[in-house]
Structures are given as C-alpha cells and as structure tokens.
Amino acid sequence: AAARNLANATSFTQTQDGYLKSAQGTLDRMGELAIRAQDATLSPDQRALYQTEFQALKDTFNDTRTAEYNGQTLFDGTARTVASSPEDLAQLSGIDLFTAEQNAVTAQATRLNTPAQAQAALQDILTATDQLATARATTGSTLAELESASTRLTTQTESTTAAFSRISDTDVNEVMTRLSREQSLTQNNLFALKQLNSNQSHLIDLLG
C-alpha cells in the first residue's frame, strides 16, 4: 500500500511540474508580446493582433491554474500527506497559482491596448514568472524526496523479506535436524530391543 501511495504522489507531483513548465512557456510568450506592444509606432491593427494572442494566452494560463489530477485541483495551495511507509508520512507542498500576482496576469485590466498598459502587464508577468520558478523548485524538491522515500521503502521491504527467508530456512533446518535425531533414536531403540529379544532366546536355549 505504501508503494502505491508513493507512486500516486509521484504522478501527482509530476503532473504539477508538467503544467508549471507549460505555464512558464505561456508567460514567456506573454512577456514577449508585452515588450513588443510597448512600441509606440505600432499600427492599431498590429496592436490588435498582439492583444488577440495575449488574451488567448491569458485563457490558457487560467486553464492551467484550474487543472486537476484525479478530481483534485493541482494549484489551490493545498498541502497533502501520504503514508510513505508503515511509520512515515511524505509531505506534498501546496502550490498556489491564485496569488494576487498570478490573478493580476489573468485580470481583465491586463491588456496591451497602449504602451503604458503593456508596460504594466509586463511587470505583472515578470512577478508571476518568479513565483512559477519557485513553484517548480518546490515540485523538484518534492519529487526528490518521494524518490528517496521509495528507495528506502524498497530497501526496507527487501530486508524484511530476506529476514523472513532466513528465519524460515532456520526453522526448516531445525525441524529436519530434530526429525533426523528422533529417527536415529528410534532406530537405536529398535536395535536394542531386537538385541534383547535375541539374548533372551539364547538364554532360554541354554536353560532348555
């Protein structure tokens, strides 16, 4: 059961990390558009194209924030624990993509309609990007801890199995030794009884 728990926790965290990596790419592109949109020489049509793509990326980023794994929200900041062995619990740190800084990226007011808006949007994106980097560092650390816990569990299981095997082998050897000893005693007793009967017959013959 503990091994299954660790496998599920690893899958959960790997899924988090995959979404965070995708979100990083989304924010990088949004930042690039925000820089381009600060060009005051852009035509209205050019700026509109940037804004259209920017809005689509905002929607994509928002979809990432609400992503789920096995019915559980990945990025609501909830910390989780799983039994990593009969005695220990593994901690899954909560990743929160609904902070004020992350919310600013997807806010309706975050637009590229003017150079000033684009500059403000870029600052929000850079702050959100820093938070994503921290979140990915957290998932990386969690995955390393889960791998370590899995290795310890495997070692513990193998050691326990080997111990039981040695105990079982010892029990079998003791039983075989005892049976052999009892069989030898039985044979000796039978031989003594046979010898006694033979002596008695010989004595009777002498007396007769």
Each model region followed by its residue ranges:
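Amphipathic alpha-helical coiled-coil/heptad-repeat segments
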Residues: 1-155, 165-169, 187-208
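EAAAR-patterned alpha-helical heptad-repeat segments
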Residues: 174-181, 188
